[in-house]
Amino acid sequence: MSAKLLYNLSDENPNLNKQIGCMNGIFQVFYRQHYPPRRVTGDELKSLPSGKASDNVGDTNISADKKETEKSKKKKTAKEKQRGVSSESSSRLSFSSSPCSSSFSSADISTTASQFEQPGLSNGENPVREPTNGSPRWGGLMMPSDIRELVRSSIHKETRTRDEEALSQQPKSARANVSLLKESSPSRNSNEWSEGRRVVKLKDSPRFSYDERETRKTGAKLKETPRLSLDSRSNSFRSARSSCSPEPQELVTGHRRTTSSVVAKLMGLEVIPDEPVTIQNRENRFCDSPRPTSRVEVDLQRSRGFDSIKKMMPAKFPMKASPWAQVDGAKNQVKIPDATTLTVYGEIQKRLSQLEFKKSEKDLRALKQILEAMEKTQQLISKDDDDNKTLCSSNFMQRNNQPIPSAINTSSMNFKSSSIVVMKAATAPVFKDTGIAGSASFSPRNVALPNVKVGNLRQAQKVIPRKQSAMDVTPRPGYYKGQTESTMKNTSTRPLQSKSDMAKSGKIQKPSVSLRTPPKKLGFEKQSRPTSPKPELNKNQRQQLSRQQTESASPRRKPGIKSRGLQQSEDRLSDESSDLRSLRSDSNVSLASNLDTEVTSRYNYERNSDITEQHTPKQRSPDLGMRSLSKPLKVTVEQPSPVSVLDVAFDEDDSPSPVRKISIVFKEDDNLSSEESHWMNKNNNLCRSIVWPESNTSLKQPDAELTEGFMEDDAEFKNGDHKYISEIMLASGLLRDIDYSMISIQLHQAHLPINPSLFFVLEQNKTSNVSLQDNKHKGRGFGQQQTVNLVERSKRKLIFDTINEILAHRFAAEGCTKQPSITLSISTQRTHEKSSRGEELLQTLCSEIDRLQDNSKCILDEDDEDLIWEDLQSHGMNWKEIEGETPGLVLDIERLIFKDLIGEVVTSEFAAFPRMLSGQPRQLFHC
């Protein structure tokens, strides 16, 4: 009866339940911003907050009253005993689940409860039911459904009365609470009043007790835990919560699904669909699985089967060679797979298979040409070296064993290996089926030549032995032994030989021509036409052929005429080789194909032929090795940029630049061109001193005689360096006879006014004098004296080179190299000013040497700018000299820029396609 009355009273006065909270209610009213209103589900945990000491008394009283109210309510319903146990356990939950429950002891709770419940105890209330604090029986028991509904209804009431709550104040609420308690039940006994008060507090206490604050905070914590980390902390909360109270499975799965979707979006992954997932798929998710590696496999299995994966694996990384390493790299493309893919991985594979290296082919066309030329040249060089070694050895043995016969008609060349012969106007032997007819002494084995076998016998038999024309006097080239048997069998489909090969064969054969064969009918009127038509010969060719004919007919002529004729014939050999090919009936040679054959074979074989020709010194002319032959240059690694700004500068003959001697295509150091070899051979004659004496005897005069003209007048020449300078000037003739016309010629050729060999001539006098003194005083200090002599020699060499450079700068500054009119005017006045100009020049050189020696003794820490400024102030520099060095500098800069551009392009291509091109890019250029 009392319980029903209290329920009705609480419904009529909704503000009554709000004001019972004491200090908790005060905080709820004045500090509402610290208690954000949140809707809390009923299945969440409840725990005590970390309250202050001031809250302990009121809250403990409320919880104690709540226990008695629950017991009285559950007596009037069915199963009174079980409801009492569950009410005690639910009230115990508010104490045991709080993190701050350790601060309360059982003694404090019992004393607080006894203070508020003394009226009930005096009226006969049995306090035996209260001490249930010691043994909490909360294990896996479920919360009663009616208490859960009671908590939910109290929360809904709180939201309706929130505006009224803000206007209430603490003193009024306290007084209203006391008056309302007195007027509510004047006729009720103390037992019913205590039971009703407990029921009211039990009904609305979750809003003001520890449970309210605890549920709000725990709800906030549980909602924010998925955002704090990506590990399985949220799962631990769920497992702890499920162990306390069974929650609906739909809520858990929905919460997991939303959490995984949020995590997937944050990580940039695709969102998992909201379809019901199985246990196997849930294990593969990122939230619940410890390792996320199986996600790719699940996606691949979802789109296609395992068999389709195996089919697509070979096309994932297509093997493709670099476009510059192959001739038609753009044509070799990987076939596009026909199977359509549904995933991103299949699309990536499809695009990788369609990839082409077109951009690099456009940007690196110059690099492609260079690399192809390098590769082709390397193959040709290695092939020619092997062929030339075998050929040189065979030719050398042939010349030593037996001379080569006079003439052999080689109309068709389809042999395993052929001989190198010269055609003469004589009856030539003809090849038969059984052997060789003609000269009885001719035999391939006796001559130590390879066995000759006619490839086309019908054409060979058609060649009738007749008197050849004067064209047949020139050397006829043939195949070398170095060619393989397989290539010789295909002569009908490939060109026979290039111009360079013919030039080599003619060059080698000339020293080995047999001169013991008697000449026969060499006149033009006694010779018939050749077997095949030949082109007309011009006047120069006829004179050349007649000169060669007379030389071969009379071998006792002077060797100078013969060597001159041989040299001229070799110079024209490349021009006449096309005419010689017309004499062959079955040759079918095209000039275009011959020009595309080996480029460097001719030059390499010429070098080897010079070695073999050294064994026949009687027939070799002295000027044979110094001739200039027009031959193609070999392409090497070092090349200028494709488009140079100095292309016109190379064609200028009067350029004073030292780059004038450098050809467009760079060559190796050991392989010099004919122009450079010819220039270097004549260097000894051109690089003379200005007034170089005809004999060295005039230089071996005493030192006193050389310096007598200057030692008497000037005492400064007593210095050793000045004395040596005067010796250099007198020995070179600059002080005696200054001829500026010769200076202009000399500086233009050698860039130095004094021949460097003059130093060694002067040192002969020094060493002769020193050797006489060493012989007299040879003994204990002989080794030390040699060391001193070496030091002095090095010092004199340094002075000599310095004087030479100073003179070169001085003469170039006066304009003697570019203004011949000035040189002539100076040369006409040299008789009047010879002595004065000589003394002035000598004094200038001595002062310059002294200044340089003083600068060498300066402090090393001195600023470089001060030294340069001092040099500029002391003597004016000829800035026009730098113009001669400009082409070389520009070429070097162009080459460096070209290398850097190629390196950057290749590196960027490797970075753009790391999977297409495996391995590290090798360094292309070594600076």
UniProtKB/Swiss-Prot annotation:
Tissues expressing this chain: Expressed in roots, petioles, leaf blades and floral organs.
Subcellular location: Nucleus
Effect of loss of the gene: No visible phenotype under normal growth conditions, but the lng1 and lng2 double mutant shows reduced length of cotyledons, rosette leaves, siliques and flowers.
Biased composition (Polar residues): 115-125, 182-193, 483-500, 538-553
GO cellular-component term (any): cytosol
Low complexity bias spans: 86-114, 232-245
GO annotation (BP), single: regulation of monopolar cell growth
Biased composition range(s): Basic and acidic residues: 146-165, 210-226, 569-584, 605-616
Entry annotated with the keyword Nucleus: yes
Pfam families reported for this sequence: DUF4378
Disordered: annotated segments: 41-198, 210-257, 460-588, 605-626
Keywords: Nucleus
Disulfide partners: none
Major localization class: nucleus
Additional remark text: The gain-of-function mutant lng1-1D (T-DNA tagging) shows increased elongation of aerial lateral organs, partly due to elongated cells in leaves, petals and siliques.
Subunit structure: Interacts (via C-terminus) with TON1A and TON1B.
Role summary: In association with LNG2, regulates leaf morphology by promoting longitudinal polar cell elongation independently of ROT3.
Listed name of the protein: Protein LONGIFOLIA 1
Native organism: Arabidopsis thaliana
